From Swiss-Prot:
HAMAP family per record: UPF0215
Top-level taxon of the source organism: Archaea
Protein name: UPF0215 protein NEQ431
Record family assignment: Belongs to the UPF0215 family.
Pfam families for this protein: DUF99
Disordered, as annotated region: 179-198
InterPro entries: Endo_dU
Length: 198
């Protein structure tokens, strides 16, 4: 893919479980390092609507035909609202890269099995977890509709100031800023997930 192709990074906002029913889903479109657009929707805490919201958000955007790929900051959003990469790819035709700062621990899978009966099946659709070395450390990732080597090159091309590719990093900052009031606040409490979450 071209160095200056547009990608959309997607992450969720802050929430407190049992207090909030919904949180923001933010899509940040970048042309390499330049922010080119911002999209948003609301998703349900521990719900099942993140995939349809991602599809709706992108498909109804003027940026749709310019976007060359989707970078999800984790596969779980708003708690246990798990992205169905197969469904997203089928509807949008865009390759998907799921990035994580670290591989998930066993507690993540146990929680999914307990609270989301079809969750493991959705996660398995994204395939194995790979890792690629960036100037800022290893980025762990899954892919759908794209090969792992091409995805690795994209991650490294977009890892400008951290090991998280710029579209996903910017989406995370915007989501945190608009829902918590401060994009610099670390994950804590109800908005953190026990695994590769956004």
């Amino acid at each position: 893919m071209k160095k200056f192709a547009r990608f959309i990074g997607i992450d969720d906002g802050y929430f407190v479980r049992n207090v909030h029913k919904k949180t923001k889903l933010i899509g940040a479109i970048t042309k390499h390092t330049i922010l080119d657009g911002v999209l948003s929707r609301e998703i349900t805490i521990d719900g099942d609507d993140v995939s349809e919201k991602i599809i709706d958000m992108i498909k109804n955007s003027n940026h749709y035909y310019q976007i060359r790929g989707i970078i999800l900051y984790g596969i779980t959003f708003a708690g246990f609202n798990i992205a169905d990469v197969e469904l997203i790819y089928k509807n949008l035709g865009l390759p998907i890269i799921i990035v994580m700062e670290r591989p998930p621990k066993d507690i993540f899978y146990k929680a999914i099995e307990k609270y989301k009966p079809n969750g493991i099946e959705l996660i398995k659709k994204a395939g194995p977890i790979y890792k690629t070395k960036t100037p800022f450390g290893y980025t762990y990732y899954q892919v759908y509709g794209i090969d792992k080597d091409t995805a690795s090159n994209i991650i490294n091309n977009l890892a400008i100031v951290s090991k998280i590719p710029e579209p996903a990093r910017v989406a995370h900052m915007i989501a945190r800023g608009v829902t918590k009031g401060d994009s610099s606040k670390p994950r804590a409490g109800g908005d953190s997930n026990p695994g590769p979450a956004g």
